[in-house]
């Protein structure tokens, strides 16, 4: 009875030990024929009562967020600790079971004789315990393998995370580099567009400037031709003035002697004198009156350049400058002798006034050209300030230097013309003073009728020597030479202009 009670107690203890792991494992061992069941999806751990909602399943891979990864690592560490604790508990339970089995075997050995019938049942129970032990060992091995696999997965996830971060950094750098490259290309494109617009504006301005310069050159060519025509007219006018002045001097001397003779002679001679010279026909032009055209000269020769075609044109068109003084004035010689002073002033004054007008026109044209050059100087300075490239700036500075040199030459020409104008005015005032002196001497000779003819001849000779027509002609020729050199300089400067 005692043995039966001991066996019953041991059986109940063994059944309680077997029942505890069956509860802790969550009904994993259900029956000997089907010892395994499906793992519950809402229970992530084996030996814990932690539950998870079925709508939020568990994933083996970590999330992309670092916090989620760290939380997963913590959970894994907790799981590992729990598994270690469970493994220790399982080993302890196995040890206790082994001790119990040893004790049970001892009890069985002692009670072999008594419990021969229960031998098969005990062997069955032993086999079941052995199978349970093998299953527990297999589960432990499987858990160890899962733990190692999870460690490898964590390492692989860390490596993938670092590689992804490196790729993101490299992609960000490439994107920034591409953006900077595109920005630089856009800035270069903007600069090229601005340069193209500037070049088109400069080209349009240059074309406009070229058109203006072509029109200016055309106008200056016409002005040069006009100046040549004026210079030729001025040359012919000066020579005609010289001839008229010489003729006037000779006529003054002859009329002074004739007047004294008339006072001594009879009055009918005056009537015959009017009949001979009252109505003068048109003066037939003789080439002897134009020494610079025909090649002969009554005075010392001068290297005077003359436009023969212009002179022939004046001859064909009845130029009053080349006609005789009596025909030009259309007054008889008797009336001319009575009014010497007034007629001499009128005969000398128009050529000098025409010369002054020509010089003033030349001076005006030179001043206009100088003003245009100053305007071009301002335009060039503006272009130099606005020029984008250094090469264009250097070219414009060279043009500006050439323009400054031309302006200096033009200023010298203006000073020369003003000097010539002042010289001509001085000569005209000197001529007027000499004519006034001649008039006074002729009036004194007319009033002093008691003087002899010898005295009149000597006074007339003295007056003739005082006037010195040869020197005046030389001065006029010198002035003509200066005008021609000025004309040549104007032509050369007009031809050499380049912008």
UniProtKB/Swiss-Prot annotation:
InterPro entries, per database record: Centrosomal_MT-associated, Cep57_CLD, Cep57_MT-bd_dom
Residue numbers spanned by region Disordered: 1-41, 255-275, 424-476
Keyword line: Coiled coil, Cytoplasm, Cytoskeleton, Microtubule, Nucleus, Phosphoprotein
Biased composition (Basic and acidic residues): 427-443, 460-474
Subcellular location, record wording: Nucleus; Cytoplasm; Cytoplasm, Cytoskeleton, Microtubule organizing center, Centrosome
Keyword flag Phosphoprotein: yes
Keyword Repressor listed: no
Chain residue ranges for the region called centrosome localization domain (CLD): 58-239
Biased composition (Low complexity): 1-16, 448-458
Highest taxon of the lineage: Eukaryota
Composition bias, Polar residues: 22-35
One Pfam family here: Cep57_CLD
Gene Ontology biological process terms from the UniProt entry: fibroblast growth factor receptor signaling pathway; protein homooligomerization; spermatid development
Gene Ontology annotations for the cellular component aspect, listed alphabetically: centriolar satellite; centrosome; cytoplasm; cytosol; Golgi apparatus; microtubule; nucleus
Tissue: Ubiquitous (at protein level).
A GO MF label: protein homodimerization activity
Major location (coarse): nucleus
Region (Mediates interaction with microtubules): 278-490
Residues found modified as Phosphoserine: 53
Coiled coil: 63-242, 388-491
Purpose of the protein: Centrosomal protein which may be required for microtubule attachment to centrosomes. May act by forming ring-like structures around microtubules. Mediates nuclear translocation and mitogenic activity of the internalized growth factor FGF2.
Subunit structure: Homodimer and homooligomer. Interacts with FGF2 and RAP80. Does not interact with FGF1 or FGF2 isoform 24 kDa. Interacts with microtubules.
Protein family per UniProt: Belongs to the translokin family.
Domain-related comment: The C-terminal region mediates the interaction with microtubules and is able to nucleate and bundles microtubules in vitro.
Full protein name: Centrosomal protein of 57 kDa
